Amino acid sequence: METKLMIASEDENSLNQAVAFLKNGELVAFPTETVYGLGADGLNNKAVEKIYQAKGRPSDNPLILHIAELAQLELLVETISPEAQFLINKYWPGPLTIVFKKTELVPALVSGGLDTVAVRMPDHKIARALIKLANVPLAAPSANTSGRPSPTTAKAVMADLQGKIAGV
């Protein structure tokens, strides 16, 4: 597979191409406020399987679902406790992951077979725009082979995952 290097920007063409890859079950690396994430449609088992394959990660290691807005969270989790609501109000969007009891909508492959799911809302314009346009939560661990350093640049992602993912 050829990996397409797209400039990490809010450019409509780049975002639309990334969304098309995601809708076709492919993987796309995208920037967040911390590191690059390796995104797949978090509700598509075949796409999620590709994350584990590309990273060489065991499938019993749960993934984080990234959302763009709170309406997405309500579909993924059974309840939002007062404590979780406090954290959401104070720290989202931002680099905080919160673990919730999941709904049946969340594939077991995403949760590593657990009855919980980890969710975060990134505070990065490109990440949020991509998730919003894709209109699905993105399962997105760091965009690197398991055991390697988490990438902070598109160049680092390309050096590690070129040929294993559709786009950066």
Identify the residue ranges that each predicted region occupies.
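Active-site-adjacent structural elements in enzyme catalytic cores
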Residues: M1-V168
